[in-house]
């Protein structure tokens, strides 16, 4: 997909702040510092629309980005970050749960994991949570450029088995450095939007 327009619309905390207009939405979820912002920037060919940070837990709101006036990407706060208080984590959890379980415009969630490591318990819980609510998931395994090509299949198998990925859900190996998986990711997103 050729992206000609991309901008942040709103950083929302409550449902009444969500944008109106009925555009399809794709939410992006992942552990803190897994590379969600890099994934967004890489997909839309922008260096810094989604701010990348070396400080995990930076995104604390639902950030809605409009893409080509056709869809919204919704950057969800990173989960599994230990340095925030329990009450903050619970508030994030409620915010994410409210969005995912009530938002009619939500078409799918892109769950981002790190291909170099087996998915964490937080990753597994997130995937199971999405499946419990019947949300389609596209699993993006980032940082593929950090692993020798010959080991991709082995690492992908670990991701698939640890998350127990539903046969209907796609697993795409991705690198924001080399752009590997970018076309496949757009293909999977388009498929979800057109369902």
Curated annotation (Swiss-Prot):
Protein name listed in UniProt: Probable GTP-binding protein EngB
Organism: Bacillus subtilis (strain 168)
Sequence positions that bind GTP: 30-37, 57-61, 75-78, 142-145, 174-176
One Pfam family named in its UniProt record: MMR_HSR1
Record key words, sorted: Cell cycle, Cell division, GTP-binding, Magnesium, Metal-binding, Nucleotide-binding, Septation
Other remarks in the entry: Estimated to be present at 1000 copies per cell.
Binding site for Mg(2+): 37, 59
Listed GO MF terms: GTP binding; metal ion binding
GO biological process: division septum assembly
Residue ranges occupied by any EngB-type G domain in the UniProt entry: 22-195
Purpose of the protein: Necessary for normal cell division and for the maintenance of normal septation.
GO cellular component, one term: cytosol
Cofactor: Mg(2+)
Family: Belongs to the TRAFAC class TrmE-Era-EngA-EngB-Septin-like GTPase superfamily. EngB GTPase family.
Domain of life: Bacteria
Disruption phenotype: Essential for growth, it cannot be disrupted. In depletion experiments cells become over 3-fold longer, are abnormally curved and nucleoids condense.
